[in-house]
Amino acid sequence: MKEIAKRDKAKVIPTGATAANRLGFSTQVPMNTIFLTTGSGRKMKLGNRTVTLKHGAPKNFAFRGRLMPELVQALRNIGEHNITQDVEARIGQLFTETPETDTIEYDLLLAPVWMRQVIKKGIKQ
């Protein structure tokens, strides 16, 4: 995906189950991978997997940090009512591994309110 994004001069972020898997919230690897892009949408076959690029809204790419856009997509996939203590602990772990202290405040304002609360709770743990 990085090569395609570089070639097209577009930003690309994983959505849904792909983001959840990449961040360690899920062990399931989706067969049909969907990415949001600032470029044009299309479908590609890579081996036995289908990769779909969908043109995303600018708000999905407004984040300054590298972790937050993917985290927002993963939490959207998990759902507000399915957040567990394990998810909150993993969020804290992610921010320990990838500290984004200079962008976190700005990025939190862009996230939906329920996600903001979950992320803040996870960071405090």
Where are these regions (language model features)?
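Hydrophobic alpha-helical interaction segments
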Residues: 55-125
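HTH-adjacent hinge/linker in prokaryotic transcriptional regulators
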Residues: 1-3
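Short gly/ser-rich loop at a beta-strand->alpha-helix junction or flexible surface loop bordering the NTP-binding
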Residues: 5-46
